[in-house]
Amino acid sequence: MDEGIVERSFMVHVNVSTRQLSEAAFVERVMGTLRETNVDAAHLTLEITEKTMLNDNPAVMRTLNALKRLGVKLALDDFGTGYASLSYLRDFPADYLKLDGTLVRDIGQHGGDDPIVRSIIQLAHSLNMSVIAEWVSTEDQKQRLKLLGCDFMQGNKVAEAVEADALGVQLRSRTSSVEERN
């Protein structure tokens, strides 16, 4: 983040597994990586699937709470398609709820998932979580999600997926073209 190629609001999202969260040294490894890359913990979001929470592993919960104390953000990924109880929303220390793309796909369609998506967004907001919708691929989906109160979106309509090396090139290019205009 030293290079000045991203805004201070830039967030890095990383998927993590139950196995990783169960490792005794996971928190120390995250801290070391943050130091090496000069990224503030507040700019890192770790994404955990509903399936991870189904394991009901006390070691995982201790790790998640330790990461939260460091300032790392947590997201409950693929929400709405698994078998997790709603009590996980209450107990899981999440900052974000990631709405699974299968629910996004049919919003705005006759008999679509608008009521379900709206309810999930309202529930997440009442628990002080922001909502990220996955698989946003049309302008109609994007506009509908805005109307339903969705906070953030991911998908082809928002930005194409890129490899890490390509992202650095794109960000540097964007920064240099902004500097040239000034």
Per-region residue spans from a language model:
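A short, hydrophobic coiled-coil helix within the histidine kinase transmitter core
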Residues: R29-T33
